[in-house]
């Protein structure tokens, strides 16, 4: 790019930023926050390497609700259980909008289920929840699919023969296969190139979007579209996944029997045919591709990441691991695999899984929200369309809700009688209207996978347990555990 083109680009960017800044002052009474600079906003106060820590630090100065400017974009930040709960639960309708998250929106254009709004989002969410809840229609249940995949995973883990290995890839393949089974109707062999492609592109995108490059792209997408860097791979990866999904949809169309749907794609295609004559229908081919992509992305990365954190925590605290195994032996034994019916009789195991999710805090800022109308909230007036960041890390680490929030402590989810105790501040799947629709599936996977693995193996670190580092490698879109290896000792 020559100097004239560069100058024109910078001038256009400056004008856009100025217009956005001026338009953000039109109405409303926003909470106080640091004074923004022209164009840059408050970026000089924020560490691009760790936006989460910077925003959390500002909440200690400005309180549980403050305004910050990410470049020209005005954002209201909510921290702590009470503020987040009042917004997402008590005033859930007003805070149910989804911001145009650039890394996704520039690909989906607001289509699909994760980043759509209004009637389209409500219709797609209701349809998807119904399909996931009633999946199978007389055929195999989701639990059966998880148990089947768990058996393949255990067989793969036995091949390690006690030698050190990195669990990332094997867990990703297995977890991804479950959502693939729901979406596409069947699992893939672990060496199937389609499965490997899905995992490769999703993992790469999750890491990029959790990096400084991803955070900068979120703030200045128009500028960074012209800048070389790893963020450019995001859309290449998305396109490859879209092409893979489109190929599967084409195969489904050729063999579709509306009376006997095999999977999510079949159900969606049938709905498309039913509403083909309705000009207001939200069921179109592009919507199918984007919704399938959203579910595939959401169902692959977060569960695998949580399981890796669980491995680290159980190796760092071997007494916790031993107590979980003792409960498994008592309730389930060794003659069969654990089942969902066992969970109610295993309060300590349930508490450990919840504590892993709280402590790991995989999606610490949730996905970005937006108010759907002018909203009176805590004495302020938030104008329609204002972006909202909910710091879920401050919910999961709120000392008013958890006795020792900075420590890994399963007792947070146990009462005085050692029975499982729910916490209203447990929000790894967010809360309110935008609660993750895959919550039930993810909870099933975490319980069935972790108990099956600990029934068969003990997790052994390569070094001293006290030296295991549980601090995340990235704190952007997601908290990622540091790379590690472990050994599995058959029990």
Curated annotation (Swiss-Prot):
Family matches, as PROSITE patterns: CYTOCHROME_P450 (PS00086)
Pfam families per record: p450
Reactions catalysed, as given in the entry: an organic molecule + reduced [NADPH--hemoprotein reductase] + O2 = an alcohol + oxidized [NADPH--hemoprotein reductase] + H2O + H(+)
GO BP, sorted A to Z: epoxygenase P450 pathway; xenobiotic metabolic process
Topology in membrane: Peripheral membrane protein
Residues reported in the UniProt entry to bind heme: 436
InterPro entries per the UniProt record, alphabetical: Cyt_P450, Cyt_P450_CS, Cyt_P450_CYP2_fam, Cyt_P450_E_grp-I, Cyt_P450_sf, Cytochrome_P450_fam2
UniProt keyword list: Endoplasmic reticulum, Heme, Iron, Membrane, Metal-binding, Microsome, Monooxygenase, Oxidoreductase
Listed cofactors: heme
EC number: 1.14.14.1
GO molecular function ontology, one term from the record: heme binding
Cellular location(s): Endoplasmic reticulum membrane; Microsome membrane
GO cellular component: cytoplasm; endoplasmic reticulum membrane; intracellular membrane-bounded organelle
Domain of life from the UniProt record: Eukaryota
Coiled coil residues, start to end: none
Chief location: endoplasmic reticulum
Family: Belongs to the cytochrome P450 family.
Function field: Cytochromes P450 are a group of heme-thiolate monooxygenases. In liver microsomes, this enzyme is involved in an NADPH-dependent electron transport pathway. It oxidizes a variety of structurally unrelated compounds, including steroids, fatty acids, and xenobiotics.
The protein's name: Cytochrome P450 2F5
Taxonomic lineage from the root: Eukaryota, Metazoa, Chordata, Craniata, Vertebrata
Protein's gene: CYP2F5
């Amino acid at each position: 790019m020559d100097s004239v083109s560069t100058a024109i680009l910078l001038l256009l960017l400056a004008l856009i930023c100025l217009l956005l800044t001026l338009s953000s002052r039109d109405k409303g009474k926003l909470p106080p926050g640091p004074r923004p600079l022209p164009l840059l906003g408050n970026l000089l106060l924020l560490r691009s390497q760790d936006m989460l820590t910077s925003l959390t630090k500002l909440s200690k100065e400005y309180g549980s609700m403050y305004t910050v400017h990410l470049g020209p974009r005005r954002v209201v930040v909510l921290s702590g259980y009470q503020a987040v709960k009042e917004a997402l639960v008590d005033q859930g309708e007003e805070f149910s909008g989804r911001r145009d998250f650039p890394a996704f929106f520039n690909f989906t254009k607001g289509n699909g289920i994760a980043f759509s709004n209004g009637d389209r989002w409500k219709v797609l969410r209701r349809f998807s929840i119904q399909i996931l809840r009633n999946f199978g229609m007389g055929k195999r249940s989701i639990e059966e699919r998880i148990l089947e995949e768990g058996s393949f995973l255990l067989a793969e883990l036995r091949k390690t023969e006690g030698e050190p290995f990195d669990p990332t890839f094997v867990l990703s393949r297995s977890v991804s296969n479950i959502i693939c089974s729901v979406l596409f109707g069947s699992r893939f062999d672990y060496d199937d190139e389609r499965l490997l492609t899905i995992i490769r592109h999703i993992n790469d995108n999750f890491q990029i979007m959790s990096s400084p490059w991803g955070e900068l792209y979120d703030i200045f997408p128009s500028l960074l579209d012209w800048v070389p860097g790893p963020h450019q791979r995001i859309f290449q990866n998305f396109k490859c996944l879209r092409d893979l999904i489109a190929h599967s949809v084409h195969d489904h169309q050729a063999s579709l029997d509306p009376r006997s749907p095999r999977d999510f794609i079949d159900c969606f295609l049938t709905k498309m045919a039913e509403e083909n004559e309705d000009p207001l229908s939200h069921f179109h081919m592009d919507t199918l591709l984007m919704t399938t992509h959203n579910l595939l992305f959401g169902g692959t990365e977060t569960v695998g990441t949580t399981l890796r954190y669980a491995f680290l925590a159980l190796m760092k605290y071997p007494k916790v691991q031993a107590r979980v195994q003792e409960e498994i032996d008592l309730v389930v034994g060794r003659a069969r695999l654990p089942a969902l019916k066992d969970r109610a009789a295993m309060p300590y195991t349930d508490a450990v899984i919840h504590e892993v999710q709280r402590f790991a805090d995989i999606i610490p800022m949730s996905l970005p929200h937006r108010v759907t109308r002018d909203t009176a909230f805590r004495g302020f007036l938030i104008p329609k369309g204002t972006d909202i960041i909910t710091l879920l890390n401050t919910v999961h680490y709120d000392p008013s809700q958890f006795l020792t929030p900075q420590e890994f402590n399963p007792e947070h989810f146990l009462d005085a009688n050692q029975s499982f105790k729910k916490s209203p501040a447990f929000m790894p799947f967010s809360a309110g209207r935008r609660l993750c629709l895959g919550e039930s599936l993810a909870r099933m996977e975490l319980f069935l996978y972790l108990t099956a693995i600990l029934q068969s193996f003990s997790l052994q670190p390569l070094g001293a347990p006290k030296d295991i580092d549980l601090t995340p490698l990235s704190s952007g879109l997601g908290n990622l555990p540091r790379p590690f290896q472990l050994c599995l000792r058959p029990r």
